[in-house]
Amino acid sequence: MTTKKKAIMGIKIGMTQIFDENDKAVPVSIIEAGPCTVLQKKKVESDGYESIQVGFYNLKEKLANKPARGHFKKANVKPLRYIKEFRIDNVDDYDVGQEITADIFTTGDLVDVIGTSKGKGFAGGVKRHNFARGSMGHGSKYHRRPGSLGAKGPARVFKGRKLPGRLGGERVTVQGLKVVKVYPDRNLILIKGSIPGPKRGFVIIKNSVKEK
């Protein structure tokens, strides 16, 4: 059975724990999901593929540029901060201006959550790549240094070598997370486990590609 594609945008509120029917503590991430507004429909005849363009999170009108204001005006909606496009099975199920709310997901659904990981700044090899430390004795000069960068022959460092650098701040997808609870009236979705990003970080929730 093929699962119908669905997605919604949200803001990470934080984490807490709830108790299930067996009185077992379950760690959950709280996401303020939607409401999202359909801004545009794309079809095979005009665009070569089917998708819907969706906006989320109110934006002051003065912060939207002129082309964006025209786009929102055409859809007859107020300016929105985040705009994403989702491939779906049938665009005819949606209308421009329609709201997508948290109740598209139900308890027990498996979802993939996409977000931007916390930025850690410049980090060394031990923290960034989980390298083993060198000897910590008094005579050692290689406590946390990277070690060899390659053989003498090429006389250069190959691309892709794991070296110190910026850690975090990257797009991360966590797959196969379980929806524990949905509160449609409060636009909240509780998902088991942790999700990428800091508090108030932007996330996208999609039904899991590994859902059976």
UniProtKB/Swiss-Prot annotation:
UniProt cross-references to PROSITE patterns, sorted A to Z: RIBOSOMAL_L3
GO CC terms: cytosolic large ribosomal subunit
InterPro entries (alphabetical): Ribosomal_uL3, Ribosomal_uL3_bac/org-type, Ribosomal_uL3_CS, Transl_B-barrel_sf
UniProt KW keywords: Ribonucleoprotein, Ribosomal protein, RNA-binding, rRNA-binding
One example of a Gene Ontology biological process annotation: translation
MF GO annotations: rRNA binding; structural constituent of ribosome
A matching Pfam family: Ribosomal_L3
Record region (Disordered): 133-152
Keyword rRNA-binding on entry: yes
NCBIfam families tied to this protein: L3_bact (TIGR03625)
Quaternary structure (record): Part of the 50S ribosomal subunit. Forms a cluster with proteins L14 and L19.
Family: Belongs to the universal ribosomal protein uL3 family.
Function: One of the primary rRNA binding proteins, it binds directly near the 3'-end of the 23S rRNA, where it nucleates assembly of the 50S subunit.
PANTHER family in the cross-refs: 50S RIBOSOMAL PROTEIN L3 (PTHR11229), LARGE RIBOSOMAL SUBUNIT PROTEIN UL3C (PTHR11229:SF16)
Protein name: Large ribosomal subunit protein uL3
Organism field: Syntrophomonas wolfei subsp. wolfei (strain DSM 2245B / Goettingen)
